[in-house]
Amino acid sequence: MSALLSIRGLTAGYGGATALDGVSLTVAAGETVALLGANGAGKSTLLKALLGLVPAQGDLRFDDGDLGPLATEARVRRGIGYVPEGRRVFPGMSVRDNLEVAGLSAARDRAQDVERVFALFPDLAAKSRESAWRLSGGQQQMLSLGRALMGRPRLLLLDEPSLGLSPKLADEVFAAVGRIAAAGTAVLLAEQSAARALTVAPRAVLLRLGRVVGDGPVASLSEEVLREVFFGV
């Protein structure tokens, strides 16, 4: 498979502290990849750097185009969607209005895009006229996913989608992520729960202190490397 996203030698930091140190990886079209690592490993920083939300140096290419000179909005228009940590919805708006507002910048039929999202998330379709604040935590996270999908991204960046959810709700959210991936969208998923992330991602990239220390099919990752990533031993 050809690379949809290519990262080479990516470096980023905050206030003089290095958060990413020469990170290189690729994501193919339609591929789901889990970014795994302990707190502070650089997972969230990597996703933000891809959107231009934090300063970074290195070679970033998406669909053979250079992302470096592009502002965040231009990167989104190129086909990158982003769901940040936490549930980002407008609680006073209906589910449908949350989706339609997210699609305002797209020169397409928003109603068609809304129905496409509802096909992926039947629970949201059943509550389309309800206010977002009435949704469960898992449903709000699904709405966040749906809002990101209104731009029809070819690559979806997810930052800790199960954070703060009960195991049952987290399972529902990851089932939704699986449906997104099955529909052909590439997914780069930052997640602290390796067991949960690997239910949808056949490949994992392991980060420790801002560096890639493992990359490959899940079955190829040794127990020793996993212990180093999560426990430093």
Residue ranges and their predicted role:
Residues 2-233:
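Glycine-rich phosphate-binding loops of nucleotide-dependent enzymes
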